[in-house]
Amino acid sequence: MYYRNFIITSIEAERILAMKFDEAFAGVKKNVIDTLNQMGNGITRASYYTSCLMDNYQDVCSKLKQEDTRFIAGLAQLVKSRDIIFQMIKIYIETYFQNKKEEKAQYILKKLVGAGVYISSSGLTNRILIMAVATMICQTSRFNTVVYGRINRARSLVLKGSVTATAVVLNVYGLIQDAANSADNLKMHNSFYYNALYANHLEMIYFLIEPVITGVPYLNPMIISDDELAELLIKLMR
């Protein structure tokens, strides 16, 4: 009986050990794949810089240099101020309120309250409503999971995934290329928000909140109805 129990225990221990090994290997594999993909993006971006050697492609060269400069500027703001992510969400909501009269805030608030969102109506203005909604969005678990997950992934790829100076450079360039791709996509699909971020030197760190913004349908701020805006805000706060 003792040996039988010992064998069963040993088999169970080996099974658990194998499962742990598989989990660890899967984690390592994902980190390696992410790092290689990031370095691949870095190599691609570095190859774009060959355009600087050709007279006919100086516009491409100029765009790359501008993206690098603005990425660093955005990153500096992120490091300097803890509320930059909040500001980006606030700017997003502001683009939808720019053509809304002050009395619309009360109507939109009623829609939000009807959906289970509590915001005080005392002295309510568009500005106060924007601040309140932006705060609630930034406090949702989904928002924090997405945004801080992206921040940690970016930091991990640049630091933990880099063992040589070349790897560091390629990972950083890969990160900038990801940021540039996200900014270009935003410019194409939501030029109002892109222009607002650009004016604040924040479009190159938009990639950190991109999944949150693209998780809701795009609606033209110039023609969005009050009901559509309320529904958009409700989706962002869930």
Report the location of each language-model feature.
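Membrane-inserting effector segments that mediate pore formation, membrane fusion
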Residues: 114-180
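Long, helix-rich, hydrophobic modules that act as membrane-proximal anchors or helical bundle/coiled-coil regulators
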Residues: 1-17, 110-125, 180-181, 201-204, ...
